[in-house]
Amino acid sequence: NSYSELLTAAIDKEAAKKQAFDEVRKNFSDFLAKRKKNQPFFYSFNPTNTHRTWVQGSGKALWNLNPDDLKGKMPPVVPDVPEIREDMADYLGEVMAFDAACAALVTMLQEMGELDNTIIVISGDHGIPGFPRGKCNVHDFGSAVPLAIRWPKKILPQRIVKVPVSLIDLAPTFLAAAGLESPDDPDGQNLLPALSQGGDDAKLRGWALIGRERHAGAARVEHNAYPVRAIRTPDFLYVKNFKPDRWPMGDPYKVTDTSEPTFAELVKNTYAAFPDMDMSPTKAWLVNHRKDAGMEKFIDYAWGKRPEEELYDLTKDPHQTKNLATNSSYSTTLTKLRDQLMSELKNKKDPRLENDAFDRAPYHTKDQRK
């Protein structure tokens, strides 16, 4: 955790790097020391360094990632400008730090002789924080995360699943790997039939549900959520925004027609404006340049209010920039996905469908901010 902060503050960078990875190895060693001989184990490694904050310019300083190399390669939902490219490079540096830590753990397993006897799963939990359509959004930039699984002799090497799956699928997958049955009507699905010899995507559901309620507690004056549910198929994303009158990234707070927080404040204080978007140089740049020519679409991607329904054709619009919910040519698809989503939510007794239960106690309390 705090990888770029630790190394940036250190006089001896190599010593600081060694300290960081020694801590990773020691935590794993301490865990294994409590293990009986040949006892199965489950170890979860969850560093937070890819969450804000990280040091501005650290991608280049620590990992030799030149932000200019990203020019022309940025997702179309953000302006391709130096400040935002640098922010992206810094994020990628934190990802590389995570990769290096994982490599240290894999090396330990190899030295123990347990590498080929261990299921290794590597995943993210959400998209990049502090970016439009990133963390806290159900669009792919915010919800599509890496998921890689290694289990020699059990999972086909380089097998790529091309239909959406979810991290809730890991629990039934682990139970199946251990020879145990999942509870009746599990939320997730066992992925092994699609990963093992003879596996194919047709053995999976073929879709995934995505949802959010709230992120920052006081993102809105009365602690109101921004409830969203979505269904992702290989070809489409359907989104249901239950409260389209609310700001999706939180209330503007200090951003008005005539005033705004400083760049420095927006980089350090998530609550300065639109608190469901984490503090970042990208967020600060967008706020400070929101009135510039050509910025309207980027501001809309970042925190503009959204319609009750969104529909995206991923074969034609992989970055989900063209909402087709009102396009009559897609009315059949819209109805089908809407019905499928609502059916699944009702089947799982989603509290949002029970008279907006998430807006009342115990899920909700009034904020005291004035």
Where do the PLM segments sit?
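Acidic, His- and aromatic-enriched active-site or binding-groove loops in soluble protein domains
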Residues: 2-32, 67-69, 207-210
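Short, charged, surface-exposed hinge/linker loops at domain edges
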Residues: 354-368
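Surface-exposed loop and adjacent secondary-structure segments within mature catalytic domains
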Residues: 1-2, 48
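Active-site-proximal cap/lid insertion segments
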Residues: 13-16, 31-186, 190, 199, ...
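Bilobed periplasmic-binding protein-like "clamshell/Venus-flytrap" ligand-binding domains
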Residues: 338-355
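Short Pro/Gly-enriched beta-strand edge/turn motifs at strand-loop
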Residues: 129-131, 208-214
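His-Asp-centered acyl/peptidyl-transfer active-site segments
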Residues: 201-206
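Short, hydrophobic secondary-structure boundary micro-motifs
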Residues: 157-159, 323, 353-356
